[in-house]
UniProtKB/Swiss-Prot annotation:
A Gene Ontology biological process term: chromatin organization
Function recorded in the entry: Possesses intrinsic ATP-dependent nucleosome-remodeling activity. This activity may be required for transcriptional activation or repression of specific target promoters.
Positions of the Helicase C-terminal domain: 711-876
Domain of life: Eukaryota
Pfam families in alphabetical order: Helicase_C, HIRAN, SNF2-rel_dom, zf-C3HC4_3
Matches recorded under Gene3D superfamilies: 3.30.70.2330, P-loop containing nucleotide triphosphate hydrolases, Tandem AAA-ATPase domain, Zinc/RING finger domain, C3HC4 (zinc finger)
Descriptive protein name: Putative SWI/SNF-related matrix-associated actin-dependent regulator of chromatin subfamily A member 3-like 1
Length: 881
DNA sequence: ACCGCCGGGTGCC
DNA sequence: ACCGCCGGGTGCC
């Protein structure tokens, strides 16, 4: 019987999997022997649409044994997900289903009786399966372990699937018995409409934010011996990122180290073997930002390199030292025949570092080859980087020949042709690095090219593309497979961890994808990049308070310190968070102008007791009123100026509709601080004073100019003297301050425009248009609230920016500057921060710096969920207690 | 004995 | 695998 089966195998395959070959593979522990165990990203039979995944729902699960454990090195601990991969070319059973662990190591097979039922349905895309191993402790059999196979199918196919499974003699444990399954299916269906497309736009959101907020990008200079062109700032930052990704020894995303063990938090895989760091990633800058030059700069380091730059220094390169070292003879011949002097080579040899392979393989579409050549000629010192064209006509079949070059250029087509050529030198070579240019061409639809590049051997892998996602997030799967980013490089894991949750509108899918891309990819868009912009300078202008202001400020600060110290002493600081914020707010307002803080609010001790305001709604209302005419803010849910303002017990502010909807939909928690929150914790804000601008105007007239206002005025006048046509923007976070500024500036002869959160969208665009209008000449000042100037607003008509008060968050300040310093800006830009001396404002600056540093040194710790914008420690620093 | 039964060899697909 | 299954050895009580 067994003999018969053996002969049924296609003869073309027999040599690959002859019993002897199997025997060798089984009992050889050499890593090389596992090379052909590597899973290609696309099984030949599964190339078509992946859409079925998103419309599927869980029909139920069957229990099946994973068998053959003793023949494979992959281990599992139980309570973890496994990858199920069809193996149609298995000689013993074309229904075979392989079981892989998080590390892509094979654990075993699904027992054949079960595979026989499931495999045909998998192949016809009728079902999708996911495997979970419940627990191995109770059932510690060395030869087989049970596994839950979850079966997903389209709603309309479910009855067929169910009967096929039971006819095959399997027991389907179905949740629809409890009527839960079906209702879930309906929900899933409804959410389908806006599933993938909209999410895709968000995938890279975190990438941007991460880069911006964490300031992770550290510029690096390419070696001058190789690269003769000066890089743009964003290219230097890109280079710094590439270097960082290649050298960093940090754990890949979703891995944690826990008492010497390494845990994959998504699959629950545990092992004491450290997962390899991901040396490489997705370089996804927009087209036209100079990715090619940046990559050439990276390659230049292989030759003249080293980190005499500002790049972070990390662990030594190459964890695969042993493996490659064994092939010493190859390296010797390849490199010593090169006569070019290499300073770095020596150093490396002394340190004992592995330098065996310095060749980078670049794969690109044929049309792009000439671009690489042009860039090489244009930007590199002639004769330094040696390039071999492995494309077209005559190509060497000698690996050693290829090793002589720094760069081997080839095309996807060439590789595809060589797929079946065993002795292809490109396939035999162990590259230092592989760069897939225009990597989106290997997306899932192009199975052959995907397969080929995935099998290439290299310790650093880069996917380079300006359009990482064309047909949906599934495109990214091909890149993961190429990067060998475990476990996502196994389709089954990708599907269950990312694709299915995403398709079902499950937040986990998107957030996982965001985290994933944030750590392994870099994407800057053309719009945000700063190519060829005139320089910008940032200055700080310190303002001395007048004696009168000083006296009031010192008095208030003294009082504030007392109040806060009291709260700290009796441990109720955080319970009185709202009080503290309003105290700090008052102090900050005083630095701008005393009239921001009306006389009745000039004492903290009278109106604010030690008890929290939350127990006194009338005080809360006062706070609301103060906030409302004071700080400019957005509803964090809809990210626009709030309508029908609601303030919560925990002092967060939302639109009425937004927060009510949120509370209804999810748990009764505040979306910002996650404190418990019910409808009774919501307080209405009093209706906004409709003619506030009129009364404010009167106020301004009656009061004299504050020190800061005077300082601003003289700065503006000095700039006007220099160039009467300079347009300026003044940002303040206090709406009232912007109103106060109008009168004195008008009086000094400036044309005033105003942009604030209370304006309609239409009005705002009108103001911005007017400000940018070249016919509006003379000294023009735009008084703007930053939050009102949403993203994408263009204020490049201005060349001076005044930040009238400092923001907590340095990124917000940066955003403000970006409105002016962006593409289209023709003049040099000067930014001036206005800071009151010896005041809380100086400490806000320090806080800014601290936050920046924190982000720099520990960017991997993304902001903790409960971290407030300002914490206890910050309060202590701000109050200089 | 074209059976039953014994006990060794063996073990994924 | 302290199992099941296979197939050879064996054969009254």
């Amino acid at each position: 019987m067994r003999v018969l089966k053996y002969f049924r195998a296609p003869s073309s395959l027999r040599h690959r999997s002859s019993p002897m070959a199997q025997f060798l593979r089984r009992f050889s522990s050499s890593p090389m022997a596992n090379e052909d165990e590597f899973q290609s990203p696309v099984e030949p039979s599964q190339q078509q649409s992946q859409d079925c995944v998103s419309e599927s729902y869980l029909i139920g699960f069957v229990i099946a044994n994973i068998v053959g454990l003793k023949y494979y090195s992959g281990r599992i601990n139980g309570r973890e997900m496994v990858g199920l991969v069809r193996e149609p070319l298995n000689v013993y059973d074309n229904n075979a289903i392989r079981v892989l662990n998080t590390r892509s190591e094979q654990v075993g097979h699904i027992e054949r009786t079960v595979a026989a039922v499931l495999a045909p349905m998998i192949d016809s895309h009728t079902i999708v399966v996911e495997g979970i191993v419940p627990n191995t402790r109770s059932n510690s059999n060395r030869y087989r372990i049970p596994c839950q196979i979850h079966v997903f199918a389209k709603l309309e196919a479910s009855s067929t699937v169910k009967s096929t499974i039971s006819r095959g003699g399997l027991v389907l444990i179905s949740e629809s018995d409890t009527s839960f399954g079906l209702s879930e299916a309906v929900v899933v269906k409804e959410q389908m409409g806006n599933g993938d497309k909209r999410s895709v736009d968000k995938i890279f959101k975190l990438v941007d934010e991460n880069v911006k907020l964490m300031g992770k990008l550290v510029a690096a200079e390419p070696p001058r011996e190789v690269i003769k062109s000066e890089l743009f700032a964003h290219q230097k930052e890109g280079l710094g990122w590439l270097l960082h990704r290649e050298k960093s020894g940090e754990l890949p995303p979703f891995w944690e180290e826990k008492d010497g063990e390494f845990l994959n938090t998504l699959t629950n895989y545990r092992s004491d073997k450290r997962p390899d760091p991901l040396r490489g990633g997705v370089f996804a800058d927009d087209m036209g930002l100079g990715k090619t030059l940046t990559l050439l700069s990276l390659i230049a380091f292989d030759r003249y390199g080293n980190a005499s730059t500002s790049t972070p220094t990390e662990e030594p390169l190459d964890g695969e030292g042993d493996k490659i070292e064994k092939k010493g003879k190859k390296r010797g011949r390849g490199k010593s025949s090169e006569s070019v002097t290499r300073k770095k080579l020596k150093t490396d040899d002394v340190v004992g570092m592995n330098v065996s392979q310095k060749t980078t393989l670049i794969v690109c579409p044929p049309s792009v080859i000439s671009a690489w050549i042009t860039q090489l000629e244009e930007h590199t010192v002639p004769g330094i980087l040696k390039v071999y064209m492995y494309h077209g006509g005559e190509r060497t079949d000698d690996v050693n020949e290829l090793m002589k070059y720094d760069i081997v250029l080839t095309t996807y087509g060439t590789l595809a042709v060589e797929e079946s050529w065993e002795d292809s030198p490109v396939k035999k070579m162990e590259w230092l690095r592989i760069i897939l240019d225009e990597a989106h061409t290997i997306k899932n639809a192009n199975a052959q090219q995907s397969r080929v590049v995935c099998k290439l051997k290299a310790s650093r892998r880069w996917a380079v593309t300006g359009t990482p996602i064309q047909n949906g997030s599934f495109d990214l799967y091909s890149l993961m497979a190429f990067l060998r980013f475990e476990p996502f490089s196994i389709k089954s894991y990708w599907q269950s961890l990312i694709q299915r949750p995403l398709g079902q509108g499950n937040k986990k899918g998107l957030s996982r994808l965001q985290v994933l891309m944030a750590t392994i990819s870099l994407r800057r868009t053309k719009e945000k990049s700063l190519i060829g912009l005139p320089p910008k300078t940032v200055e700080t202008c310190y303002v001395e308070l007048s004696p009168e202001e000083r006296q009031l400020y010192d008095h208030m600060e003294g009082e504030a310190k007392g109040v806060v110290q009291n709260l700290i002493n009796n441990g109720s600081l955080m319970r009185n968070y709202s009080t503290v914020l309003s105290i700090i707010l008052r102090l900050r307002q005083l630095c701008d102008d005393m009239s921001l803080c009306p006389p009745e609010l000039r004492s903290f001790t009278t109106s604010t007791s030690v008890e929290d305001v939350t127990d006194k709604p009338e005080l809360l209302q006062k706070l609301v009123a103060a906030l409302q005419d004071g700080e400019d803010f957005d509803c964090p849910i809809c990210i626009s100026p709030p309508t029908n303002i609601i303030i919560t017990r925990c002092a967060h502010i939302f639109c009425r509709a937004c927060i009510l909807q949120t509370l209804q939909r999810s748990k009764p928690l505040c979306p910002l601080c996650r404190g418990s929150l019910t409808q009774s914790d919501l307080y209405n804000a009093p209706p906004p004073p409709p003619d506030s601008s009129n009364t404010d105007g009167e106020d301004a007239k009656s009061s004299t100019k504050s020190s800061k206002v005077s300082a601003l005025l003289s700065l503006l006048m000095a700039s006007r003297q220099e160039n009467p046509n300079t347009k300026s923007v003044v940002f303040s976070q206090f709406r009232k301050m912007l109103l106060l500024l109008e009168t004195p500036l008008k009086a000094a002869g400036f044309t005033i425009l105003r942009l604030d959160g209370a304006m309609t969208v239409k009005k705002r665009t009108q103001v911005i248009g007017e400000f940018g209008n070249p016919e509006l000449t003379g000294p023009v000042v735009l008084l703007a609230s930053l939050k009102a100037s949403g993203t994408g607003i263009n204020l490049t008509a201005a060349s001076r920016v005044y930040l009238f008060d400092p923001w907590w968050n340095p990124a917000v300040e940066e955003q403000a500057m970006d409105r002016i310093h962006r593409i289209g800006q023709k003049q040099e830009v000067k930014m001036i921060r206005m800071i009151a001396r010896n005041s809380i404002e100086e400490r806000v600056l320090e806080l800014q710096q601290k936050k920046k540093n924190l982000a720099n040194e520990a960017f991997k710790r993304r902001q903790k969920k409960d971290e407030r914008e300002v914490n206890v420690e910050d309060v202590v620093a701000l109050m200089s207690l």
